[in-house]
Amino acid sequence: MQTDLSNSSLFNHKSVMTDEILYSIDQYPFISDNKLTAIDATLGGGGHSYQLLKKYPDLKIIGLDHDPIARESALNKLEEFKSRIEIIPSNFSNFEPKEKVSFVIADLGVNSNQIDSPERGFSFQKDGPLDMRMNPLIKMNAENLIETLSEKDLADLIFKFGDERLSRKISRKIKKDLKEKGKYSGTKDLAYSIAGCFPPKQRYRKIHPATRTFQALRIAVNNEIEALEKFLKIAPDWLLTGGIISIISFHSIEDRLVKNSFKGDYRLKNLTKKPITPNKKEIENNKRSRSAKLRIAQLK
C-alpha cells in the first residue's frame, strides 16, 4: 500500500529535516528492521549520517562529497561510527555503488560552513574572493565565469538559475563595472554592484538583492543542475526493490526537477504528493531551513 508522507509534521552546520527523514524510513519495516546499507549522497558535515547511524545500530553508510573540507568535518563528527561509515571523494553524479542499498538521501543545500567561510566566496555577508567552488580542483570559479561570459550569456544564466527578473540590467552593470575596475575586489564588491540595479526601497529588504544572482553563479560554477539531472537518472538503480530515496531541495529549480523525476520515472512510486516542509520549531531554530522541501520516492 502506498503511503503519502506529505502530511507528516515531525520535527549543527544544522542538518535540516532529519526527523522527517528518520520518520520516512520507519514507515518501511523492510528497511528499518534489517541490516542495511545506505548512501548519503551529500555527506557535508555528516549531520544526517550521524543521526541515522545513531538510530540504526546495524546501519552502514557510504557518504559522498567532493568537498575535501566537508569530508574532513564529517570524518571528525562520525569518529565514533568509523567502522560503519565509508567516505568517498565523489560528486553524486559520478558514483556507482558496488551493491544496491536500502535507501538514499541527498540534501542539495549549501553547507553552512561553506557559506560562513569567507575564503570560499559563497556569501556577500563576509567579504571573500569570488570563488564559489565546492570542489577546489575544478578550474572555473565565479570570477572566471563573470570575466569570460558575454553580457547576454551572463544575463541568461542569472535568469535561468536565479529566477531574477532584472537579469539583463544586472548583467549589464556587472560587465560595465568590471570593465571600469578591471577586477572585482571580492564578494561584497560584486554584491554592491548588483544592489545598484534595484530601487532604493528594495536594497534593504530581508532578502538581499544580490541573493538570486549569487545563487545563479554558484549553480553555474558547480554544474549543479546538470549533476542533479544525472543523479536523478542513476539513483533509482542504486536501490534494492522497495528501497526509498529522500531528497531535500532549497530552490524552485531543484524542487521542480525532483518532483518531475519522482512523478515521471516508471521505476519509482512517488510518496509525497506535496513536498514536506520544516515545521515551525525547526524554522525558528534554523532560519536557513525555511525554504527546504523534502520529497520521497520508493523503488517499485
Curated annotation (Swiss-Prot):
One of its GO terms (cellular component) is cytoplasm. It catalyses: cytidine(1402) in 16S rRNA + S-adenosyl-L-methionine = N(4)-methylcytidine(1402) in 16S rRNA + S-adenosyl-L-homocysteine + H(+). SUPFAM superfamilies: Putative methyltransferase TM0872, insert domain, S-adenosyl-L-methionine-dependent methyltransferases. S-adenosyl-L-methionine binds at residues 46-48, 65, 92, 107, 114. The keyword Endoplasmic reticulum does not apply. GO terms for molecular function: rRNA (cytosine-N4-)-methyltransferase activity. Disulfide bonds: none annotated. Its EC number is 2.1.1.199. Keywords: Cytoplasm, Methyltransferase, rRNA processing, S-adenosyl-L-methionine, Transferase. It is found in: Cytoplasm. It holds the Pfam family Methyltransf_5. Specifically methylates the N4 position of cytidine in position 1402 (C1402) of 16S rRNA. Belongs to the methyltransferase superfamily. RsmH family. PANTHER family: 12S RRNA N4-METHYLCYTIDINE METHYLTRANSFERASE (PTHR11265:SF0), S-ADENOSYL-METHYLTRANSFERASE MRAW (PTHR11265). This is Ribosomal RNA small subunit methyltransferase H. It comes from Prochlorococcus marinus (strain MIT 9515). The lineage of its organism: Bacteria, Bacillati, Cyanobacteriota, Cyanophyceae, Synechococcales. The gene is rsmH.
